[in-house]
């Protein structure tokens, strides 16, 4: 099975207008990613406000994304839920719509044991025939995979990758040493991408690439060609952007940045709220200093 979980994966925002999906803006967002040839697009993840979507909205978002992208780059769906039965529904629907793979985190809030986490993902694995990427986001989930659970899950044939949003930079080395050869490890933190890849990572799921896919793609290409100096130069330029996009809870800042550049409305669903004036100013200044344009 081809492992699509590698390279630059954009964690796409979900555009809204008048509290409904804005499908015209979605087309702009996705075509911007296609233009710069990102390696995959993640739909309805944390950055895409997946937890705020109704099931009907989720289906419409995936179906429209598949139609717009039209097999030009892989589409990965977010299937995280603290309700295993509902997560299975999301995975089954993703299979029906024919996305290329899905990502899911351990159930949040309920704090399952490691055995419970394993059984949750075993159930998702049984619900579909898609490649799966584990999503380690302990600050959001309240729980995390142990190394042993990652190893155990990696033995399921279609669990092919781990997206790691933790801060343990030794972890990719530990995991890489014990999992199957074709199991990929990616970071979900923009600002540590080079350090993470130096420890065995093969790419990253990026928030910043919503608005700077060209720079993010070039950074990774230079890194993969062993042009460490060139990759570091781009990384240093992007660091202020990475930080600005997390000055408030993600996806608040990136939604405003996309609005400022004309990609979509600055509409975000409760309990998230619009960026503060100070955050807006910081984002505007960095976009201007980096000469980011569509």
Curated annotation (Swiss-Prot):
UniProt similarity note: Belongs to the DapA family.
The protein's Enzyme Commission number: 4.3.3.7
UniProt keywords, alphabetically: Amino-acid biosynthesis, Cytoplasm, Diaminopimelate biosynthesis, Lyase, Lysine biosynthesis, Schiff base
NCBIfam families recorded: dapA (TIGR00674)
Enzyme class: lyase
Localization annotation: Cytoplasm
Gene Ontology MF terms: (R,S)-4-hydroxy-2-oxoglutarate aldolase activity; 4-hydroxy-tetrahydrodipicolinate synthase activity
Source organism (scientific name): Rickettsia felis (strain ATCC VR-1525 / URRWXCal2)
Catalytic site positions: 135 (proton donor/acceptor), 163 (schiff-base intermediate with substrate)
Biological role: Catalyzes the condensation of (S)-aspartate-beta-semialdehyde [(S)-ASA] and pyruvate to 4-hydroxy-tetrahydrodipicolinate (HTPA).
Native organism taxonomy: Bacteria, Pseudomonadati, Pseudomonadota, Alphaproteobacteria, Rickettsiales
Subunit-level organization: Homotetramer; dimer of dimers.
Residues in the signal sequence: none
Any one GO cellular component localisation term in the record: cytoplasm
PROSITE patterns per record: DHDPS_1, DHDPS_2
GO terms classed as biological process: diaminopimelate biosynthetic process; glyoxylate catabolic process; lysine biosynthetic process via diaminopimelate
Main location, first listed in the record: cytoplasm
Residues flagged as site, Part of a proton relay during catalysis: 46, 109
Entry protein name: 4-hydroxy-tetrahydrodipicolinate synthase
Catalytic activity reported: L-aspartate 4-semialdehyde + pyruvate = (2S,4S)-4-hydroxy-2,3,4,5-tetrahydrodipicolinate + H2O + H(+)
Domain of life: Bacteria
Gene: dapA
Annotated PANTHER family: 4-HYDROXY-2-OXOGLUTARATE ALDOLASE, MITOCHONDRIAL (PTHR12128:SF66), DIHYDRODIPICOLINATE SYNTHASE (PTHR12128)
Pathway linked to the protein: Amino-acid biosynthesis; L-lysine biosynthesis via DAP pathway; (S)-tetrahydrodipicolinate from L-aspartate: step 3/4
């Amino acid at each position: 099975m081809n492992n699509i979980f590698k390279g630059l994966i954009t964690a796409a925002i979900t555009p809204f207008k008048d509290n409904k999906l804005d499908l015209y803006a979605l087309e702009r967002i996705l075509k911007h990613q296609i233009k710069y040839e990102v390696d995959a697009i993640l739909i309805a993840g944390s950055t895409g406000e997946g937890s705020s979507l109704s099931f009907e909205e989720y289906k419409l978002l995936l179906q429209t994304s598949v139609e717009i992208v039209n097999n030009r780059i892989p589409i990965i769906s977010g299937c995280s839920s603290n309700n295993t039965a509902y997560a299975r529904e999301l995975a089954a629907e993703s299979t029906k719509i024919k996305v290329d793979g899905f990502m899911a985190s351990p159930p949040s809030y309920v704090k399952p044991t490691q055995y419970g986490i394993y059984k949750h993902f075993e159930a998702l694995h049984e619900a579909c025939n898609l490649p799966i990427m584990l999503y380690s986001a302990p600050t959001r989930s309240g729980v995390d995979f142990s190394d042993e659970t990652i190893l155990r899950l990696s033995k399921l044939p279609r669990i092919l990758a781990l997206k790691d949003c933790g801060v343990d930079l030794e972890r990719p080395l530990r995991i890489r040493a014990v999992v199957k050869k074709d199991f990929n490890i990616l970071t979900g933190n923009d600002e540590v991408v080079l350090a993470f890849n130096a420890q065995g990572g093969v790419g990253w799921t990026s928030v910043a690439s919503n608005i700077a896919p060209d720079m993010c793609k070039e950074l990774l290409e230079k890194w993969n060609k062993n042009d460490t100096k060139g990759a570091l130069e781009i990384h240093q330029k992007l660091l202020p952007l990475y930080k600005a996009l997390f000055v408030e809870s993600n996806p608040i800042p990136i939604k405003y940045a996309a609005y400022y550049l004309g990609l979509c409305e600055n509409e975000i669903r409760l309990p998230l709220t619009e960026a503060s004036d100070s955050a807006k100013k910081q984002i505007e200044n960095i976009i201007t200093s980096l000469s980011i344009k569509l």
